[in-house]
Structure formats: structure tokens, C-alpha cells
Amino acid sequence: MDCPHQDVLHLIKYFRKEWPVVSDSERTTICGADNMLLTLQLALAEVNKQNGKEFSVSLSDVLLTWKYLVKHKLGLACEDTVVPKDYADIQKTYDLFLKNSNSLDLIDIYEKISTAGSSEAHFLSSEQLLDFLTNDVCLSEGTDFPIVSTPCKNNLDTVKVKPTLKRIFLAYLNLLVNAKNDFALAQVLNCPERGLGREAFTDLKHTSRLKNMSIFLVATSFIRTIELGGKGYAPSESDPLRKHLKGLSLFVHFIDRLNEIFGETHDPRTAGELLLSTIKMHLIKGRGSGDPLSEAATEVAQDLDLRIKYLINLVSEDKSSGTTGISPVRPKIRAINRGTASGGRETIKTLLKLLDEEAANPPSKNKADLLCADEENTLFGAFSLFTLFRSPEQTGSSPKALSQRVQKAINKDKPKLKHNLIRSQFACTYKDSNLTQTKQWDFPSMSQVPS
């Protein structure tokens, strides 16, 4: 396989072309190799929590389960292969995460195209896709990769700032295209700082499960109800989301600003530039022009803007070269954004192509750097996915925090001191039963004196 990245991208392009046959929604986003691994990490931790353990998982368990999951989904697992513990529950939780986020992973794309009987699937075999996902590909000569290091405590250096900023920009664009994507929302909910940390995300997550809605829809409906519903429809005072009202309002209103660009800007080039510029200004607000983070955000926005314009130019060239004098096909009934302007629809299609290119990227070389994010270092207020999904609230079956368990063990080993009960400020007027009993034995009555 000369260029696995291009073969995977070709597979994704065919999926977009034939989406009415193989998918239920044109806005379905594709989960790349790195996001597949992050989703599996969350699924493993969730299963551990359901089994009464902590919401955590070791790096070795994630990597071992990852290799088996890829082989099993591709039908390449050998009969004598050791099946990871609780694998059925892990795969079920993994698939549920993707389904709730209206996403498909690369293996799902391959299976759907193969099931449809398309010859496009033969350009990429299951063994080649396995090698691509597990990093066992033959790289062409002259390919250089950056040297990665073991995660450290202070890892907010210039090398890692731009990739993190790029993920934030793409997460915002992903959320605009697919409002059901909870993983995209988790990356931008508190980015920039809005006071929406782990507690706010946990409250949103619990409410979304109770109402069977996406987290973004929960936040939007809560703000709309307060702003437009009136007193009769206002949420109760005990609603856990009320304490996050200010931050949720800022977040929802900013997404509204981005959505307005789709309706007001018909040219996809201008719309893409405005979207990236709005996100950039929102992130660097309050920072000076010479701030390193501001400069990095500007560079990332410019790079993505050039990529969007390049994709638009490719579409224009294809249309001009493929003109045959035949009238264009009428839009499909289930087309993107059919109730809005065609300009907004073209912008969303362009953003989907950009996100698809990112999904076709090879997996990261350093899995530890990807999975073991530092909880103390946050960029623009953004937390890692694993940090957010690990609920700070403990359920009845979940163990208490480690600090609480240690303190309880220390208190248990301490000798307990017995104090006499003081009944009132005039305790000296009361007779102590123990003292009375002692005096009774020390000074027996005459009847107890032996004759």
C-alpha cells in the first residue's frame, strides 16, 4: 500500500457520495483513528465504573483491547486469541458512544461500503485497514515525523500548543455540522473559560441521559426555556443547570453567532473565513498581540482557512472539467440544511470535507501522549475528554474518592477517647453513677460488714 492515507480518504469520499444508501444522515461525522482510541478509553473506564470500580483504566489495557477491537470488527481475530475481560460490554458501550454522537468510525465506513456491494471497497482490504489503524504501515522513504517525548507535568510548550488549538477549532466546526457530537462539545464547552468545568459537564451529561437528548440540545433548550418560556415554563429552582446559567448562556449565544454566519453569508469562502476569524477572536479575547497563544491561534486559523479555500477550488475545478451540457441533478430530499440558503449548505459540505480529511489522518505515534493528558494543564480552559467524562459525583455503587478513603482509614486506627457527658453547666450537682458505684464498694454499709 503506497499511500494508506489517500486510500482511507478515498473510502470516506465514496461514503459521502453514496450516503443515502449507507447512512441515515448526511451530517454524520467520521471518527478517525485517534478519536476511536479515545472513545475506547472512555468505554473501558465506563465499564469499570459499572462494575463497581473507579472510572479509570490503565494504558496497557487500552492498547491491548484496541488491538483486539480492530481485529474483531474487521473479522480478522483468530480463534485462539485471548478475549479481553468484559469485551462484550466494552464493545457495546463503545458503539453506544458513537451512536449517541451521530458518528461512525473508519471500520464502520468500510463495512457499510462493503455490505453495499461497491467495488470501491476493494481499493482497501481489511488487512490494509488493520495495518493503518495499528500503525503497522510501510512508510515511504523521506517521511519525517516530529520527535515526541513522554508526557510531563509542564507540557504546554510551543510544539503542543498548535495541535491543541487545531483540535479546538475543528471541534467548534464539528459541533456546527453535527450538533449531536458530545465529544466535540466536551472539547469546547469551557473554551475559552466560561466557568463550565467538570461539575457543569457532569450536570449536563446526567440531564442528557435522563431526557435522552444530546448534551448540546440540553444546554440549548435550557437557555431557550429561560429566555422565551416565561414563568410557567421556567425550570425549577432545584434544576442543577441553574447554577451554570451564566456560562451556558455565553456558550449557546456564541454558537448562535456562528450559525448566523451560515444564513447570512452565501459565499462558502467568505463564510469559512468569518467562522475561523470569529472563533479565533473569541479564544484570544483579552490577550495582547504579542502573546504566544494569540500568535499560535492566528497561524492555526490561517492554515485552516487556506485548506477550506483549497477544497472549494477543487470542487470548482471538478465542476468546470466535468461539464457535459446536462442539467444538474435535483437536490436530494434528505439533503443538508434543506430549509436554509444554498450558500449555507455549500459551507457545511465544505466543512464536512475538511473534517473527513482529518479523520483520514494516520494514528498518533505516541499513544501515551494521546491518552494520558495532564489534568492540571489546560489551554484556554479546555479539559481532556477523560477528565470531563470522569464524573466528580459518586454514585451509590462507586467507591469514594481516594483521599476520603485514606482519611477514613486513619481515623479508624486512632484510639478513641472517652469523655464524661456534661449534662449542664451545673454538672457538679449531679451524682456520677460510676463514682457512686465505686464509693459503694469502697465504703460498704454496716449490713455488709461480716459479723
Set out the residue ranges of the language-model regions.
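Conserved helicase C-terminal RecA-like lobe
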Residues: 2-451
